[in-house]
Amino acid sequence: MPLYVIDKPLTLHILTQLRDKNTDQINFRKNLVRLGRILGYEIANTLDYEIVEVETPLGARTKGIDITDLNNIVIINILRAAVPLVEGLLKAFPKARQGVIGASRVEVDGKEVPKDMDVYIYYKKIPNIRAKVDNVIIADPMIATASTMLKVLEEVVRASPKRIYIVSIISSEYGANKILSKYPFIYLFTVTIDPELNNKGYILPGLGDAGDRAFG
């Protein structure tokens, strides 16, 4: 399964600041932007490229790489927590077209939230996805039960893009397995895999509610 855990010293340093309850709102958002940019560069390493030849100012010719798929990127922002993450991704993919999806979990009465939650999409604005051409990147900082992501994937998979990437900061073991079991062709990029979900569907140890911490 194409699971990429980008657990390098720098990404883990930034993740530690995100987890810290004392990190303020401004720095929380800035750190999401930083990780979005780093994860974007990691994704770029998996895109299709061509070997090209260029001439330097000294008149010498040398071979290099042209990542052709940099022109074929669609980034989908799952509101609202993904906004800073997408800001970082756009620094890595400045030519990307953007889409937005608003999704919400159906509230459940009771103390315990089921892992298979109903999700409804209340807003959707996605650019045309060119079949077998575009690489779609779906951004959501936290993949807990994966219910929201699976709902969004239903929309994206129908368009038959060339590749589908998911970018998250923290994925639960349950959520990652659920996504990749259903869609084994998807590329999931995350900084870490956390082992648990609590009875409200939050990741443990996690970092709290990313949307609330980023925007209040």
Curated annotation (Swiss-Prot):
Q: EC number(s) on record?
A: 2.4.2.9
What is stated as this protein's family in its record? Belongs to the UPRTase family.
Q: Which UniProt keywords apply?
A: Allosteric enzyme, Glycosyltransferase, GTP-binding, Magnesium, Nucleotide-binding, Transferase
**What function does the entry list?**
Catalyzes the conversion of uracil and 5-phospho-alpha-D-ribose 1-diphosphate (PRPP) to UMP and diphosphate.
Q: Which residues bind 5-phospho-alpha-D-ribose 1-diphosphate?
A: 80, 105, 140-148, 209
Where does the chain bind uracil? Answer: 203, 208-210
Protein name (record) = Uracil phosphoribosyltransferase
Give the cofactor binding note: Binds 1 Mg(2+) ion per subunit. The magnesium is bound as Mg-PRPP.
Annotated Gene3D superfamilies: 3.40.50.2020
Family matches, as HAMAP family? Upp_A (MF_01218_A)
The residues that hold GTP are 30-34
* Catalytic reactions of this protein: UMP + diphosphate = 5-phospho-alpha-D-ribose 1-diphosphate + uracil
Which cofactors, by name? Mg(2+)
One GO-annotated biological process of the protein: UMP salvage
The pathway is: Pyrimidine metabolism; UMP biosynthesis via salvage pathway; UMP from uracil: step 1/1
Q: How is its activity regulated?
A: Allosterically activated by GTP.
The molecular function terms in GO held by this entry are: GTP binding; magnesium ion binding; uracil phosphoribosyltransferase activity
Give the organism, scientific name.
Answer: Saccharolobus islandicus (strain M.16.4 / Kamchatka #3)
